[in-house]
Amino acid sequence: MADDSGHGQLWAGITALYAEPGVAQACLAAQDEAGADVLLLLAAALQARCGISIAGAGPALVAAGEPWRSEVVRPLRGLRRRWRGLDGVEALREHLKVLELEAERVQLERLAPLLAGPSAEATSALLRANLSAVEPSLSLQRLDGLATALERGWRAAPGG
């Protein structure tokens, strides 16, 4: 992905948002508890920050991303997690982390055409609607906690 492309800007926004305090923890809790796709959660949040509703595209985004996620991203993540704390594999585990992130970049590039949507005002309600569109199984409590962390993060992240 070229850095000057819309995909590159979206990826940069995702990594910046993920680095904000509380965002990673909220996303990983949703991933561990509900099987949420962190990449989709972050992309949905960034689109909401730009005032773009993806509510109508939620099922298509999930369906389009699932084959790559299940065949590439999840196996890399699973192996990396299983190797946590094992002696002598730290460097190899870091390589897996790099591959996992690159696989998520490729997933984002594949999903980018589906992330376009009608413009609206960037509001908390739009953020929650976008998150619900890509992860409808999240409990209301998990959705609220995630939305709060993401909204706090998007205000602090560059471009917020």
Tell me what each language-model feature is.
Residues 10-32:
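Short amphipathic alpha-helical segments and their helix-coil junctions
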Residues 49-111:
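Structured binding/interaction patches within domain cores
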